[in-house]
Amino acid sequence: MSLNNITFCVSQDLDVPLKVKIKSLEGHKPLLKPSQKILNPELMLIGSNVFPSSDLIVSLQVFDKERNRNLTLPIYTPYIPFRNSRTWDYWLTLPIRIKQLTFSSHLRIILWEYNGSKQIPFFNLETSIFNLKDCTLKRGFESLKFRYDVIDHCEVVTDNKDQENLNKYFQGEFTRLPWLDEITISKLRKQRENRTWPQGTFVLNLEFPMLELPVVFIEREIMNTQMNIPTLKNNPGLSTDLREPNRNDPQIKISLGDKYHSTLKFYDPDQPNNDPIEEKYRRLERASKNANLDKQVKPDIKKRDYLNKIINYPPGTKLTAHEKGSIWKYRYYLMNNKKALTKLLQSTNLREESERVEVLELMDSWAEIDIDDALELLGSTFKNLSVRSYAVNRLKKASDKELELYLLQLVEAVCFENLSTFSDKSNSEFTIVDAVSSQKLSGDSMLLSTSHANQKLLKSISSESETSGTESLPIVISPLAEFLIRRALVNPRLGSFFYWYLKSESEDKPYLDQILSSFWSRLDKKSRNILNDQVRLINVLRECCETIKRLKDTTAKKMELLVHLLETKVRPLVKVRPIALPLDPDVLICDVCPETSKVFKSSLSPLKITFKTTLNQPYHLMFKVGDDLRQDQLVVQIISLMNELLKNENVDLKLTPYKILATGPQEGAIEFIPNDTLASILSKYHGILGYLKLHYPDENATLGVQGWVLDNFVKSCAGYCVITYILGVGDRHLDNLLVTPDGHFFHADFGYILGQDPKPFPPLMKLPPQIIEAFGGAESSNYDKFRSYCFVAYSILRRNAGLILNLFELMKTSNIPDIRIDPNGAILRVRERFNLNMSEEDATVHFQNLINDSVNALLPIVIDHLHNLAQYWRT
């Protein structure tokens, strides 16, 4: 049997510098019109606005895309004056050898033009140095196409047969006939020079060296860890600044200051980098030969206290090099401490083979971590697939009720598991689903278990997904997504929330759309019918809301239209068969009550709709179109979680976490609980006690209200004071502080959170004097109970701060407005409210002072009066 021989060389054997030829730039952008030259004469200083073949300079730089670090300094083409075309034909030799390249090495190409005497970027491009499909070094010609008006985006021209044939000819794949080759090559080159592109489209032509043999990338593994200690020159742990190089940046910034203080500042480009000496010491210290010695090491009392201090740091705290070294040194001693695992992973460089292998083995023997630590491992910081799979395995032990509390954040965490983001390539945990059959099949028969045989397919998906459409490619389901899908298939309630969370977030996140398709394809007929009914209900409610909003008439006319729409559109739908409400899938509705439904006076015309359940109970909800409810949904979910945490400690503060579900980016439903605003209560009853007396009077009680009602009021006030303080809820006024007839106090409208507030000098806690008056005054026993409830609630929530902070950490990349403004700052503000650096006694004193300041504050009272005055003039 004959074998095909393939001759090639490996990149590690090539001790020659990398060369790239900048050939030419085709295309031109629209020039300035005469009117533009008159109105904006400064634009004429930019050459490309005036001349079709304006002067350009090209810079090349090699960078490692996976590790986010530069490998060389940029080098530039010389100045060449152009006439009719932009042609350089100039070889650039980069200061790096081929054997030093990594597989993720890319070329950063920047075209520079002149704005007067100053150089400015014309366009930024990048291209890989190795072919992603076969791991070979690029050879021959390559063309990069880009549009001038699409920033930082380019693509390799793959449909150019002439260029492909030229490459094959120079690589020796065609039989050479000198008399014919000369004619053919000159004709092919002339065709390439005469090709035209649409205005605004450019093509940069490059040429890589035409080596005789293909060069295959191979990374050799050195077994002796101590011999593999990098120097400053090739240290892969050093991070560099990835900003675009600007040749006009000053290297020294000088400020004169005054005669007493010097403010001379030097720019140090190495300041953010790791210290090479410390890096070298770290690698020596963690060499595999020391592992056996570390197993016997135990800390003394002082060191043990130091380790406990590190372990108790809140999530997201960055450890110093010394702290990381201490955790690593005593890793075997800490194996029984479940809280120490996340700190160990922070202290480990998972890109180092020896460290990664050892830590992953340790994880299997580590004490089982809590759910809050598992959630931390699913954040954007931990990209190693094995670590994330470990966290998913821990989540598998959580109950459906627990999973529902964290489901919103887990859906966001799925976005971190895009295949291309992982630092390791052992993607054996992924599930591959056929995208075509997923539209037709259901059940598990269409799943393909990933093994070594299809890892090649997995890699091709990640490399080809950028150039080819994802519609015909297989869907890659990460371990977390697969876990959520399987749990959602088993539990219809969980499945309903999972569907709507994906639906509301998938508009700008294509990966979530793939997960939604996979989930839908595996639903059985009954579950699919349930969700189909919910979708039809939401579509009808949206149509009703938009129809009423378009009606420019009185509220009475809108009410008539609402009654008509409910009777003709909603009632026929819910009468066919009971529908599980998306807000609460356990509630089945079978009819609608138009007589108790209404349209609110607002520019968005939200609808309050009353449904009749199969238990013959009314269910009120509000449906809005044109408002993003995802922030309110997050806040209510966190309030529900905090309520469960308090109840787990046998502390029931009578909270009212009404349900909110965003069914899209600009629409959603809200559970409507019968209530009155504090502004309305004070206007009608001149006090909260008068309102409570009307519904539940008791002549024998001191304040004239039944004891359990007043108990509800005191407890719920304490709970919401603590929670809104921690979440930094802003824009608090008497119109979004609500009270139910049985004394439950709660907040509504969470448009401003995490310290954001439209008013100046907002209070840290909203505690109106009317509430203290309803307690019986600041000297009453109810006020003392209120304070004690606050202290207990604050203490319990501080003990669970890690869980809450991890949930916010998972929402960093979400579209929540007040998180999107400053994701890191938002989490920092929540952490500050917990005051985790304080002892239990100091935290209680802090909250006592907070209550005192809120009770005695005058500015919030003035702002409330101004708000009431503004509301009066609006109505």
UniProtKB/Swiss-Prot annotation:
Reaction(s) the record says it catalyses: a 1,2-diacyl-sn-glycero-3-phospho-(1D-myo-inositol) + ATP = a 1,2-diacyl-sn-glycero-3-phospho-(1D-myo-inositol-3-phosphate) + ADP + H(+)
Residue intervals of the C2 PI3K-type domain: 14-188
Domain PI3K/PI4K catalytic stretches: 593-859
Keyword list, A-Z: ATP-binding, Autophagy, Endosome, Golgi apparatus, Kinase, Membrane, Nucleotide-binding, Phosphoprotein, Protein transport, Transferase, Transport
Gene Ontology MF annotations: 1-phosphatidylinositol-3-kinase activity; ATP binding; protein kinase activity
Annotated stretches, region: Activation loop: 747-768
Ranges for region Catalytic loop: 728-736
Domain of life assignment: Eukaryota
GO terms for biological process, alphabetical: autophagosome assembly; autophagy; cellular response to potassium ion starvation; endocytosis; late endosome to vacuole transport; macroautophagy; pexophagy; phosphatidylinositol phosphate biosynthetic process
Top-level EC class as recorded in UniProt: transferase
Subcellular location: Golgi apparatus, trans-Golgi network membrane; Endosome membrane
PTM statement from Swiss-Prot or TrEMBL: Autophosphorylated. Might also be phosphorylated by VPS15.
Gene ablation phenotype (knockout): Abnormal localization of the peripheral membrane protein PIB2 to the vacuolar membrane. Decreases activation of TORC1 in response to glutamine.
Alphabetized Gene3D superfamilies for the sequence: C2 domain, Phosphatidylinositol 3-/4-kinase, catalytic domain, Phosphatidylinositol 3-kinase Catalytic Subunit, Chain A, domain 4, Phosphatidylinositol 3-kinase, accessory domain (PIK)
Domain annotation PIK helical: ranges: 293-526
A Pfam family the protein falls into: PI3K_C2
Record comment: activity regulation: Phosphatidylinositol 3-kinase activity is directly dependent on VPS15 protein kinase activity.
Enzyme Commission number(s) of this protein: 2.7.1.137
Spans annotated as G-loop: 599-605
Cysteine disulfide partners in this protein: none
PROSITE patterns: C2_PI3K, PI3_4_KINASE_1, PI3_4_KINASE_2, PI3_4_KINASE_3, PIK_HELICAL
SMART domains for the chain: PI3K_C2 (SM00142), PI3Ka (SM00145), PI3Kc (SM00146)
Oligomeric and partner information: Component of the autophagy-specific VPS34 PI3-kinase complex I composed of VPS15, VPS30, VPS34, ATG14 and ATG38, and of the VPS34 PI3-kinase complex II composed of VPS15, VPS30, VPS34 and VPS38. Interacts directly with ATG38. Interacts directly with VPS34.
Other observations noted: Present with 1080 molecules/cell in log phase SD medium.
Record's function text: Phosphatidylinositol 3-kinase required for cytoplasm to vacuole transport (Cvt) and autophagy as a part of the autophagy-specific VPS34 PI3-kinase complex I. This complex is essential to recruit the ATG8-phosphatidylinositol conjugate and the ATG12-ATG5 conjugate to the pre-autophagosomal structure. Also involved in endosome-to-Golgi retrograde transport as part of the VPS34 PI3-kinase complex II.
Protein name: Phosphatidylinositol 3-kinase VPS34
Gene: VPS34
